[in-house]
């Protein structure tokens, strides 16, 4: 896959999926495509699922969420397309729907079974998962041409609404039985106020659920 191309590793996916991969994909789509294929190869050689933070060819498990599908979907959207999207989409789906999927010894999505079965989990992790699911849906639709799969992942992405507590007006973690955890619990490297806006694909839905523009 990388004959006469460069393997790109030591990519901090969670720190680069928001802006860096988009810029790189516009400026040098071949290098960005190599990054995508390098992630594919790493997954295929390391348990079948994508990593999220690789250092010296080791999946460290640092940070949370499932950032690689977001990175890849953004690379595709911004012009890095020199690869076959179908096997990449297959890897995305494995991590998103098969509890226990791993990259090396690191579980791709901790808490995935509860997330899929109940539609809620720890708040900041779930908000990362829903962003990843929206990205997978976009990749399914535009790169693979699978409209049915895209709507499946868009449905998962909308589960952020299950975190909204109308009594407090904030997004909160929930226990397995559906009860609310303490406001601010389970937010990593941030606060519940910062993470409140972590639905960039559905800002209109967030504004609506809190009561309109005046509330926002």
Q: Which residue ranges define each predicted feature?
A:
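Active-site cavity-forming subdomains of large catalytic enzyme subunits
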Residues: 43-160, 166, 189-190
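Conserved active-site and cofactor/substrate-binding residues in soluble primary-metabolism enzymes
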Residues: 14, 30, 67, 83, ...
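Conserved small/polar residues in nucleotide/adenosyl-binding loops
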Residues: 7-13
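Catalytic cores of carbohydrate-active enzymes
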Residues: 50-51, 142-216
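Short alpha-helical scaffolding segments that buttress acidic/His motifs in well-ordered protein cores
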Residues: 36-39, 92, 157, 203
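Alpha-helical support elements that line or immediately flank enzyme active sites
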Residues: 15-31, 73-78, 138-144, 197-211
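Single conserved hydrophobic/aromatic residue that forms the stacking wall/gate
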Residues: 1-7
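Glycine-rich phosphate/pyrophosphate-binding loops
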Residues: 27-50
């Amino acid at each position: 896959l990388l004959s006469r191309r460069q393997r790109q590793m030591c990519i901090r996916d969670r720190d680069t999926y928001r802006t860096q991969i988009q810029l790189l994909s516009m400026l040098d789509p071949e290098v960005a495509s190599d990054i995508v294929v390098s992630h594919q190869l790493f997954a295929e050689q390391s348990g079948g699922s994508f990593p999220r933070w690789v250092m010296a060819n080791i999946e460290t498990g640092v940070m949370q969420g499932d950032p690689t599908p977001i990175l890849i979907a953004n690379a595709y959207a911004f012009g890095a397309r020199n690869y076959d999207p179908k096997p990449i989409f297959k890897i995305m789906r494995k991590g998103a729907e098969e509890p226990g999927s791993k990259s090396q010894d690191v579980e791709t999505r901790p808490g995935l079974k509860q997330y899929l079965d109940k539609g809620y989990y720890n708040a900041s992790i779930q908000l990362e998962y829903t962003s990843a699911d929206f990205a997978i849906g976009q990749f399914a639709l535009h790169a693979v041409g699978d409209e049915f799969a895209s709507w499946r992942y868009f449905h998962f992405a909308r589960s952020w609404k299950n975190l909204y507590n109308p009594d407090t007006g904030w997004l909160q973690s929930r226990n397995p039985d559906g009860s609310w955890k303490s406001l601010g619990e389970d937010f990593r490297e941030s606060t519940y106020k910062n993470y409140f806006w972590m639905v960039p694909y559905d800002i209109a839905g967030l504004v609506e659920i809190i009561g309109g523009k005046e509330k926002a």
